[in-house]
Amino acid sequence: KATLNHNLLVDRYYLDALEQGGLGRTVADLPEIGTPAALRTAQAAQDRRLTAFCDRLEASDLPRRVDTDRGRPVPERIDHLLAHLFQHQIHHRGQAHAMLAGTGVAPPQLDEFFLDYDRHPSVAELGLLP
C-alpha cells in the first residue's frame, strides 16, 4: 500500500507541475488512500488525467519549461519531466508487481499492451487502441 500511495503522490506532484496547478509540495499533505479499491480508482483517475495532458501537447510544448516546487521554483523541461515521471511509474509499478507475485494475489498484466498478439483487454479500457 505504501508503494502505491507513493506512486500516486509523485504522479500528482509532477502532473500538478506540468499543468502549473500551483499545489507543489503540498500534494504530500493529501491523505494516504487506505484500501486497494480506492487506490485503484484514484490511480486510474490520475492516469486518465496524465493521458489527457499528453494528448493536448504539441511538439513545441516539449522543450518548454515549467516550475517544479523544490522549496524554491526549479524550472524543468516538459519532455524531461514526462520521461522522469514515466520512469518513476515503471519502477514502482514493477516493484508492486514483484511484491504481489510473491503472494497468492495475481498481479495485473503489465506486458502486452501495444502488440496485436496476446493484447490484454485492459488496453481498450485505457484508450490505447488506435
Name each model feature, range by range.
Residues 21-63:
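Helix-adjacent hinge/juxtasegments
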Residues 64-68:
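Short polybasic amphipathic segments
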